[in-house]
């Protein structure tokens, strides 16, 4: 088969195949997503997201776009910050994840606009949002550079992008982290979610994602300024921040 190639975990696939394969993974894990996140990270994902929410300097009435918002953890936090005067969009490219996220928010009495949206072709006008966030979603995108440019496009001048993503762990911990990721994680996926393969992909996709400095440069290339990052949990995850001027 012809066409441009890209990675799907450690495998090489045609670019036009990756989105479908990623979709299969998240259709499979959607119902158990929050449970698995708690188990896999020993609850740390909630700490990472809480830090991300506290990093944003939002005010009442601000507009926020949550990309790859999944089960709505960040959207929930953003909505509390911007109040009823504000606007928070929960978006995801995966219908199963979006349905779970919408239902979770509804169960808490939160009615937010939701959109089935591809981050590489965002259905929003230029210069609209004060904040764009993407948590644990960028690594699954086929054309990360295109997605980052789209995020920049929809931000108002002075607006902020926050990217929370798995990253490059400190070198002395690599051996233990690899054992956990490739030996234990798929077993947990099989026992809890009845799906070892999706969690094997998760481990592989983390290793293929750009490291902290590479992602920083990608954000600069996409049009962001004042780009910096903060490592958490020894570099297991990093929060990148960029501003559109």
From Swiss-Prot:
User: What pathway does the annotation place this protein in?
Assistant: Quinol/quinone metabolism; menaquinone biosynthesis; menaquinol from 1,4-dihydroxy-2-naphthoate: step 2/2; Cofactor biosynthesis; ubiquinone biosynthesis
Q: Which SUPFAM superfamilies does this entry report, sorted A to Z?
A: S-adenosyl-L-methionine-dependent methyltransferases
**A Pfam family of this chain:** Ubie_methyltran
Query: Which superkingdom is the protein from?
Result: Bacteria
The record's listing under InterPro entries reads: SAM-dependent_MTases_sf (IPR029063), UbiE/COQ5_MeTrFase (IPR004033), UbiE/COQ5_MeTrFase_CS (IPR023576)
Class of this enzyme: transferase
Q: Which UniProt keywords apply?
A: Menaquinone biosynthesis, Methyltransferase, S-adenosyl-L-methionine, Transferase, Ubiquinone biosynthesis
Provide the E.C. number(s) assigned to this enzyme. 2.1.1.163, 2.1.1.201
**Positions contributing to S-adenosyl-L-methionine binding:** 71, 92, 118-119
Residue runs in coiled coils: none
Q: Name one GO biological process term.
A: menaquinone biosynthetic process
The record's disulfide annotation reads none
Q: Which family does it belong to?
A: Belongs to the class I-like SAM-binding methyltransferase superfamily. MenG/UbiE family.
Q: What HAMAP family does UniProt report for this protein, alphabetically? A: MenG_UbiE_methyltr (MF_01813)
Task: State what protein this is by name.
Answer: Ubiquinone/menaquinone biosynthesis C-methyltransferase UbiE
Organism placement in taxonomy:
Bacteria, Pseudomonadati, Pseudomonadota, Betaproteobacteria, Neisseriales
């Amino acid at each position: 088969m012809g066409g441009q190639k890209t990675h799907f975990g450690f495998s090489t696939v045609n670019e036009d195949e990756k989105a479908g394969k990623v979709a299969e993974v998240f259709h499979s894990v959607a119902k158990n997503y929050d449970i698995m996140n708690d188990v896999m990270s020993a609850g740390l994902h909630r700490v990472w997201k809480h830090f991300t929410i506290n990093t944003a300097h939002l005010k009442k009435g601000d507009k926020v776009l949550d990309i790859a918002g999944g089960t709505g953890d960040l959207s929930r936090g953003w909505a509390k910050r911007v109040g009823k005067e504000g606007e928070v969009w929960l978006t995801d490219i995966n219908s199963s994840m979006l349905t779970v996220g919408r239902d979770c928010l509804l169960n808490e009495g939160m009615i937010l606009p939701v959109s089935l949206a591809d981050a590489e072709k965002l259905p929003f006008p230029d210069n609209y949002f004060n904040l764009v966030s993407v948590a644990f979603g960028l690594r699954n995108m086929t054309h990360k550079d295109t997605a980052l440019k789209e995020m920049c496009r929809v931000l108002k001048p002075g607006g902020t992008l926050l990217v929370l993503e798995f990253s490059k762990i400190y070198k002395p911990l690599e051996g233990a982290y690899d054992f956990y990721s490739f030996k234990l994680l798929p077993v947990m996926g099989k026992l809890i979610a009845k799906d070892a393969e999706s969690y094997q992909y998760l481990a592989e996709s983390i290793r293929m994602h750009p490291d902290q400095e590479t992602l920083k440069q990608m954000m600069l290339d996409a049009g962001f300024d004042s780009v910096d990052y903060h490592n958490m949990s020894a570099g297991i995850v990093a929060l990148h921040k960029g501003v559109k001027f």
